[in-house]
């Protein structure tokens, strides 16, 4: 794929905080793999759409599956397609399997398509590609896999919050977003053939 090989991206996996979603007694790559496995049955419902969108945008389908797993647990934590309820706004901040940020003070995107549609997955992939490009421009000295990891972190919290490779997840959800997503993607690639 044109954005780097997900299998060559360094990862420390899920933080303790993220692993507590599933009440795991451990963190790291093992925890990310366990959570990806938990979501794998639901993920199969979306395999053909994921593969189609991956081919269309040059994104490894395993990475799309991993973002879906991390963001919405393959749809399991959504409420009529919505997630990340903001009590201050009295509204949800994110839409669909890939949790596209619709908060006007956040990503400000307009939700496209049904929450589990190929149109929605395409929107998520476009946002990811945009952020990978932003990170490539911001950090031209990083190798392709580092730029991919930075783009994944930026998908979660914007490229303005990525300041260094060593602390790429410093401002991400759980302090581990790109590391968790990469570990899940590696699992989906090797264990489920995405």
Swiss-Prot record:
The species this protein belongs to is Epinephelus coioides
Question: Which GO cellular component does the record give, naming just one?
Answer: extracellular region
Q: Which residues are the active-site ones?
A: 71, 84
What Gene Ontology molecular function terms does this protein carry?
lysozyme activity
Keywords linked to the UniProt accession: Antimicrobial, Bacteriolytic enzyme, Glycosidase, Hydrolase
**What lineage is this protein's organism placed in?**
Eukaryota, Metazoa, Chordata, Craniata, Vertebrata
Q: Which family does it belong to?
A: Belongs to the glycosyl hydrolase 23 family.
Tissue specificity remark: Expressed in intestine, liver, spleen, anterior kidney, posterior kidney, heart, gill, muscle and leukocytes.
Reactions accelerated catalytically? Hydrolysis of (1->4)-beta-linkages between N-acetylmuramic acid and N-acetyl-D-glucosamine residues in a peptidoglycan and between N-acetyl-D-glucosamine residues in chitodextrins
- EC numbers for this chain: 3.2.1.17
Q: What is this protein called?
A: Lysozyme g
Write out the GO biological process terms. defense response to Gram-positive bacterium; killing of cells of another organism; peptidoglycan catabolic process
Q: What does this protein do?
A: Has lytic activity against M.lysodeikticus, V.alginolyticus from Epinephelus fario, V.vulnificus from culture water, A.hydrophila from soft-shell turtle, A.hydrophila from goldfish and V.parahaemolyticus, P.fluorescens and V.fluvialis from culture water.
Gene3D superfamilies xref list: 1.10.530.10
């Amino acid at each position: 794929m044109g954005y780097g090989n997900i299998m060559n991206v360094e990862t420390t996996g899920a933080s303790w905080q993220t692993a507590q979603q599933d009440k795991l007694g451990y963190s790291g790559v093992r925890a990310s793999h366990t959570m990806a496995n938990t979501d794998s049955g639901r993920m199969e419902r979306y395999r053909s759409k994921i593969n189609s969108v991956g081919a269309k945008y040059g994104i490894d389908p395993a990475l799309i599956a991993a973002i879906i797993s991390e963001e919405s647990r393959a749809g399991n934590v959504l409420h009529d397609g919505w997630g990340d309820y903001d009590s201050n706004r009295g509204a949800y901040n994110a839409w669909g399997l890939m949790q596209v940020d619709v908060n006007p003070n956040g990503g400000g995107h307009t939700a496209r398509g049904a929450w589990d549609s190929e149109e929605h997955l395409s929107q998520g992939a476009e946002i990811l590609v945009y952020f990978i490009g932003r990170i490539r421009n911001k950090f031209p000295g990083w190798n392709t896999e580092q730029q991919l990891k930075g783009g994944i972190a930026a998908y979660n919290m914007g490229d303005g919050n990525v300041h260094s490779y060593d602390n790429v997840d410093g401002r991400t959800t759980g302090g581990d977003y790109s590391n968790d997503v990469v570990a899940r993607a590696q699992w989906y690639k090797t264990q489920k053939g995405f």
